Each structure stands twice: as structure tokens, then as C-alpha cells.
């Protein structure tokens, strides 16, 4: 560190940020808004993006327009407009306008009216946190359904020119690229909105999704090629450095200036400075310098996935790869290339798991093929766009090699996806696992300093030791120290989704659907499962056929995200309901066995977990789907929980007459907290201590009804509403239980 003062400065900065981060974690506590209020605002445009269905502009220097000001006619402000103004002063603002809105130039001042919202916060474990994502960009509010009131002031010529160039190039890729346009727009322009979701997922599964972002790799390839070309053609060090530095800075700004691009640009500028002043470029010092600059300006990026992966990848190249090469006397360029990929993979896997919960076994192999070909993809893509300004046909011809290379990428990803082990779902590691993992890597460096390189006679034992070291790293990440039973009532909006996990690895999922959240399986259920390292459900139990209980489960059955299902369990009722036939057919296509659940049947696990069906009786015919709902009693030691689906009052009273119910600890209140279910008589028999009500914010049914909440309170039962608290999680050892809520419940086992 004495030879690298910038590395020491970076280390001290990181230490200081970690020490003071706890005190700053609640900085946004004063940014809460009471609801979705209509407001009028003014600010300066610093960024513009054209999306498929909207025009998005980003404002800074925000202020609330008071009634009576120019441009505020026909608009009203909320009573607490002054408070909003104070909050917005600390925030940038994203405004979503109609797609047909006239272009608003960067640098101008805009007055707009719309609905002020907070970005969606994660309410379930594993769910993507839009609030945190936008906070890393300095954005704490979004103005939705907006309309412009006035545009004034001069625009920023440089930024507007770069943004217009980006939009023009994007349209040119559409003209020459056809189905491949989205790839080049992502790779060269940083615009991912036109990339098909299926292809994004495919590249991620193959472990090569990093090439779809403007990353350090792109800046390095383009910047180094430009600088070397200028030097080769007689340009001096200073002139070549200034030209290439300015052009790469302009390119980074044009493509959105993401954190990875910032890191690469800063390191590139350090490299150019070394060239100009005749100094030796040090990779780690350049990395540390870029970290200090970025974190000083935006300390919230310390927890950003792009920041962490970008810096760790270069750290792996600058430390782990040369260490391994030195220990084993590796000089072969091909082997060094493999070591580079392996070093990046080893050092970034824990962070990838922290954010994405899964990894790819074949990412390293695919990258060995994909990365050497990437310069050709970028070159032919850029050439096609450039020639396309002269002739579309000629541009298409120039673009052709790029098309076939992208097809090769797709073929490789599909091949990898078809192989066993293509998707390893390990879940989010715990903090102690991260410390142990990186502690072992630090121990490797310490051991290398003490013992040095292997001699020829010690290479075989050294290789065996290396294999043992990798096995130790893997063991740390897969180690599971959980115990007991975990029940999670997911926040799926207006719907139901319940996960039951035992410490022996058995997992059952009850229902899974929503009438208020789109693609609830993809965005809430599947991320939750992956967060806990769940890639297989022993049973998927659907209580009845309403869409708010099955549409997310249908996504699971379709199997696009690699979640295996041991058995689909449907209610054993007398009905010709088409929805059950559809589910049976879909399960048959996926080779998933289907079983039918009726009263008296049970699932018994060796660890003591028991699921007993109380309703419906075999062949039961109800007046509605809700009346068909499977009612399940869970037992684990002395702990009891009751799941009631959308059971209606008539069936509830019928089961009371049959004396089917007994005392429970936790109740899943029927039908999202409807007025007539969960009667006084039912509560007197079951006497639950806690009732979980799964319902959506502002739902049109008025769930949960005040009458129900009153009944629960009078019965001495605490109510937990997912719309207010997020996911509700119960963890029990079979005797006592703890209950916690939110995206990071304290009851993690």
C-alpha cells in the first residue's frame, strides 16, 4: 500500500463510508409522501430517454409551482405543497410524458403537472427494489401521467447534440438491423428498452449479459483502438490523448454514463495521463482513483450492483489472476486468458448471488468464445450504421457479419441452457458467508507472500491444493445453517401466495396469483424462491381456480425460470371448470404429476411437518369457486397454522358443524379479509393469536372489511396486512414462533 497511495486513500474512504453508513441509512425517512398527489413542478432537464410507450425526462433543481405562478393555471397543489417542495429540493425527478410529446431539449426549464409518486419499494424478500435503484441515481420521486405546462430557457448544445445523435443512431439500427437492432442499441448506445425480454433472460442464463451494457470492456476496446490508431498515424502523445479522451468522454455521456462506464473512463484517462507524461500505468492505482472519484460524488453507489461487479471484476484481473499465474509459473496467453475469466468469476460470484441469487456454470466457457468475437460484433454493427446513412442496402450488407455472430451467441446460450447445471440457484448468501469467502481469498494472498511460488516438483500438490481451495470457497456459499420451519405470506397485491419451507429442504407453495400485480410470478414469487435458494417445489397446492390465486402459479408451471415442481395439487371437487382442465393440460406438457386433495388426505414429512386437508370432501360441489377452496391445517410440533383460501361463510359454518377446526396459532384469514368470512363462531373455536390478511392497496373490494378487523380485535387476535407490512414471515421450532415483516424479515433462518 505504501507504493500505491491511491489504493490506501480508497481503502480509508471505504472504511469511513462503512462506519458512517448506519447513521445515514434512514436519510429518506423525511421523504415520505402521504399518497399519490397531483402537483405542478419546475426543473431543468438533464437527460431524455425515448421509451416504447413514453417519453422520459429527468429534472434537477426542482421546485413546486405555487398557484398563481406563470404556467400553473388550471392546476392545484396539495395542502402540504411546501413540504413537498422541501423534499423535492433534495431529489432529482423522473417525469413520464406521452410518447407523442414534442421533443424537450436538454438544458431547458420545464414546468409540468402530474401525479407525484414514490418508486415502488420491495415488499418481499428477493423482489427488485425500484426505490433503491432510483435512489442510487439521486431520484426519490416520479411524476406520472404528466403533461407539460411550459418550456423555457436555452438548451445545452453539447448534451442535446449527443442525445439527438444517440436517438438518430438508434433509429438507424432499427432500419438496418431488423430483429438484431435491440442488441446493437444495447451494446453501443446503452438503450435496452427495445431488447426482447426472452433474449435478456437467455444472455443472463448463459452468463454473458454483461456484453449488453456499456461497460468497461466497451470503453477499453473502443478507447484503446482509437488511441493506438492515432498514435500509429503519427499523432503525438498529447494530441492523441486529448482527442481520444474527449471523444470517449463524449461517448460515455451519449450512452448514459453508467457507473461501469464512469469507472472505465476514469481509468482510461489515468492511462492516457501516464502515456502523456511518460509514466508507468498501474491498474490498481487507476482502479482506486476511479473509486475515490465516483464514491466521493455519489456515496450511495457503494451498494450498487453495477459498481460492485465492475470494480470487483477489475480487482480480480489486477490481483487474483497475476497471483495464480505467478504461483504456477503460467506464461501461455491462452491459459492466462482462461485464468482472467476464472479470476473474475471467483471474485464476483458472491456479489452476483447477493443480487441475483443464481449463477451459471457455463459462463466462463461461453465468455472464452464470446469476448474475443465482441470487437467484431461492435465493429460490424457500427460500420453498418455508418454506411446506412449513405445507403440502407449497403448498411444491411455491412451489418450481415454482426447478424451471424449474434446468432452464434444465441445458439451458444441456448445450448448452455439445455445442459444440466446451467442455472445454479443458491440464494442470497448471509453476511458471514461473504466475510469468510473473501477472508479465504485474503488468506491465499497472505500464503503466497509467505511461501512464494511452487517449484516444478510441487506443482501437482499445488494443483490439488488449488482444487481444495476452490472447493472450500464453494462450500462456504452453499452452506445452509437454517433450522426449523419458515412460512412466508408473500405480498402479491390482491391475491394469495404462501411458501412453506422446512429445514430438511422440503418446500410447498400454496396458491400464487394476483389481480392487481402484472406477472406476479416473474416479479414477486420467483425472485422470492430464488432469494432462498429454492429451485424445486415438492408440491404446488392451488386451493381453487380464481385468477388471483393461480396466474402466478401458472408461470411456475410453465417452467420458464427453471423452478421444478414435484406435484401439482388441485381440489378434488365435482366441476367441469375449464380452468382446472387447462392447469392439468399445462402440467401434463411439463410432465408434472397432478393429484387431487380432499378432506382427510394429508402430507407427512419425516421432520414432523404435517399438512392435513379439512375441505373439500371428495366430489364436493359448491355454489362458487370460493366455496371449493382447499382448507389446510399445518402442524409442526405444537405449532398450528390454518390456511383457508377464499372459503365462504356457508362452507365455514358447515365445517364448524362437522367440528373440523381446532385451536391454531396463526390464521390465514379467508378471502382477503372479506366481510362475511372468519365469523365470530369460527374465531371462538380456532382462537388464533395472529391473522394474516393478504390484500392489495386500494383494492376495489374494500378488503379487509372493518367488520372483520373488529371481530379479530375482539377475539384478541393481532392482524397483519400484507398491503401495509409487506411479506409476513413466521419462523418456528415447533414450540415457539417469531413473526416479522417486509423485504428483509428478521426471521431469516
State where each predicted segment sits.
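Transmembrane alpha-helices and immediately adjacent membrane-cytoplasm interface residues
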Residues: 4-30, 473-478
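Hydrophobic alpha-helical transmembrane segments in multi-pass membrane proteins
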Residues: 8-10, 143, 197-364, 380, ...
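Membrane-interface helix/helix-cap signal primarily in integral membrane proteins
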Residues: 16-210, 523-527, 536, 581-605, ...
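Aromatic-rich juxtamembrane segments at the membrane interface
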Residues: 136-267, 272, 346, 488, ...
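Membrane-interface amphipathic/re-entrant loop segments adjacent to transmembrane helices
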Residues: 150-160, 205, 353-369, 381-438, ...
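Core dinuclear metal-dependent hydrolase active-site scaffold
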Residues: 192, 295-303, 414-539, 588-666, ...
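Metallo-beta-lactamase
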Residues: 537-548, 573, 667-671
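Cap/insert and terminal regions of metallo-dependent hydrolase folds
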Residues: 567-569, 652-726
Amino acid at each position: 500500500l505504501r507504493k500505491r497511495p491511491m489504493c490506501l486513500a480508497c481503502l480509508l474512504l471505504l472504511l469511513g463510508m462503512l462506519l458512517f453508513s448506519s447513521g445515514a441509512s434512514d436519510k429518506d425517512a423525511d421523504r415520505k409522501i402521504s399518497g399519490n398527489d397531483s402537483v405542478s413542478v419546475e426543473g431543468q432537464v438533464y437527460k431524455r430517454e425515448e421509451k416504447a410507450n413514453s417519453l422520459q425526462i429527468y429534472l434537477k433543481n426542482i421546485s413546486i409551482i405555487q398557484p398563481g405562478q406563470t404556467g400553473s393555471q388550471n392546476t392545484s397543489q396539495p395542502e402540504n405543497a411546501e413540504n413537498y417542495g422541501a423534499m423535492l429540493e433534495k431529489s432529482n425527478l423522473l417525469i413520464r410524458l406521452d410518447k407523442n410529446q414534442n421533443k424537450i431539449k436538454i438544458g431547458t426549464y420545464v414546468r409540468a403537472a402530474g401525479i407525484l409518486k414514490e418508486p415502488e419499494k420491495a415488499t418481499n424478500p428477493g423482489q427488485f427494489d425500484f426505490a433503491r435503484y432510483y435512489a442510487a441515481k439521486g431520484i426519490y420521486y416520479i411524476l406520472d401521467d404528466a403533461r407539460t405546462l411550459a418550456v423555457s430557457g436555452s438548451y445545452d448544445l453539447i448534451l442535446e447534440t449527443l442525445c439527438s445523435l444517440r436517438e438518430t443512431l438508434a433509429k438507424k439500427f432499427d432500419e438496418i438491423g431488423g430483429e438484431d437492432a435491440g442488441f446493437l442499441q444495447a451494446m453501443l448506445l446503452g438503450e435496452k428498452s427495445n431488447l426482447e425480454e426472452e433474449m435478456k433472460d437467455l444472455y443472463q442464463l448463459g452468463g454473458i449479459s454483461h456484453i449488453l451494457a456499456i461497460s468497461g470492456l466497451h470503453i477499453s476496446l473502443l478507447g484503446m483502438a482509437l488511441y493506438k490508431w492515432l498514435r500509429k498515424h503519427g499523432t503525438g502523445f498529447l494530441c492523441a490523448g486529448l482527442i481520444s479522451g474527449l471523444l470517449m468522454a463524449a461517448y460515455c455521456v451519449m450512452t448514459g454514463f453508467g457507473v461501469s462506464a464512469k469507472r472505465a473512463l476514469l481509468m482510461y484517462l489515468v492511462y492516457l495521463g501516464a502515456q502523456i507524461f511518460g509514466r508507468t500505468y498501474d491498474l490498481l492505482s487507476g482502479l482506486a482513483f476511479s473509486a475515490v472519484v465516483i464514491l466521493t460524488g455519489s456515496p450511495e453507489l457503494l451498494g450498487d450492483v453495477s459498481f460492485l461487479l465492475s470494480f470487483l471484476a477489475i480487482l480480480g484481473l489486477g490481483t487474483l489472476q497475476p497471483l495464480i499465474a505467478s504461483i504456477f509459473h503460467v506464461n501461455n496467453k491462452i491459459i492466462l486468458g482462461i485464468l482472467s475469466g476464472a479470476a473474475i468469476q471467483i471474485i464476483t460470484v458472491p456479489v452476483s448471488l447477493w443480487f441475483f441469487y443464481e449463477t451459471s456454470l457455463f459462463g466462463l466457457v461461453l465468455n472464452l468464445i464470446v469476448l474475443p468475437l465482441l470487437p467484431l460484433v461492435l465493429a460490424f454493427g457500427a460500420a453498418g450504421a455508418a454506411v446506412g446513412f449513405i445507403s440502407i442496402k449497403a448498411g444491411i450488407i455491412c451489418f450481415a457479419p454482426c447478424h451471424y455472430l449474434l446468432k452464434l451467441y444465441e445458439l451458444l446460450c441456448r445450448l448452455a441452457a439445455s445442459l444440466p447445471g446451467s442455472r445454479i440457484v443458491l440464494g442470497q448468501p448471509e453476511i458471514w458467508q461473504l466475510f469468510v469467502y473473501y477472508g479465504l481469498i485474503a488468506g491465499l494472498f497472505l500464503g503466497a507472500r509467505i511461501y512464494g511460488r511452487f517449484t516444478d516438483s510441487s506443482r501437482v500438490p499445488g494443483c490439488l491444493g488449488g482444487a481444495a481451495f476452490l472447493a472450500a470457497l464453494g462450500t462456504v456459499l452453499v452452506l445452509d445453517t437454517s433450522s426449523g420451519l419458515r412460512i412466508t405470506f408473500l405480498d402479491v397485491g390482491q391475491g394469495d401466495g404462501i411458501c412453506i419451507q422446512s429445514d430438511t429442504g422440503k418446500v410447498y407453495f400454496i396458491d400464487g396469483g394476483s389481480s392487481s400485480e402484472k406477472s406476479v410470478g416473474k416479479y414477486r414469487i420467483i425472485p422470492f424462491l430464488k432469494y432462498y435458494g429454492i429451485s424445486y417445489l415438492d408440491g404446488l397446492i392451488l386451493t381453487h381456480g380464481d385468477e388471483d390465486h393461480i396466474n402466478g402459479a401458472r408461470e411456475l408451471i410453465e417452467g420458464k425460470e427453471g423452478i421444478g415442481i414435484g406435484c401439482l395439487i388441485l381440489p378434488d371437487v365435482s366441476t367441469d371448470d375449464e380452468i382446472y382442465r387447462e392447469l392439468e393440460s399445462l402440467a401434463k406438457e411439463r410432465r408434472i404429476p397432478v393429484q387431487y386433495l380432499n378432506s382427510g388426505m394429508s402430507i407427512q414429512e419425516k421432520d414432523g411437518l404435517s399438512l392435513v386437508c379439512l375441505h373439500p370432501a371428495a366430489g364436493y360441489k359448491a355454489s362458487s369457486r370460493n366455496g371449493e377452496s382447499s382448507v389446510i391445517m399445518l402442524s409442526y410440533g405444537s405449532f398450528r397454522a390454518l390456511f383457508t383460501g377464499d372459503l365462504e361463510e356457508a362452507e365455514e359454518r358447515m365445517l364448524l358443524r362437522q367440528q373440523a377446526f381446532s385451536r391454531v396459532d396463526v390464521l390465514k384469514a379467508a378471502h382477503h379479509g372479506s366481510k362475511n368470512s372468519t365469523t365470530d363462531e369460527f374465531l371462538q373455536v380456532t382462537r388464533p393469536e395472529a391473522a394474516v390478511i393478504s390484500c392489495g392497496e386500494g383494492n376495489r373490494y374494500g378488503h379487509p372489511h372493518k367488520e372483520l378487523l373488529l371481530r379479530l380485535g375482539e377475539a384478541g387476535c393481532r392482524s397483519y396486512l400484507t398491503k401495509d407490512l409487506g411479506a409476513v414471515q413466521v419462523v418456528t421450532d415447533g414450540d415457539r414462533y417469531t413473526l416479522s415483516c417486509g423485504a428483509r424479515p428478521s426471521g431469516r433462518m
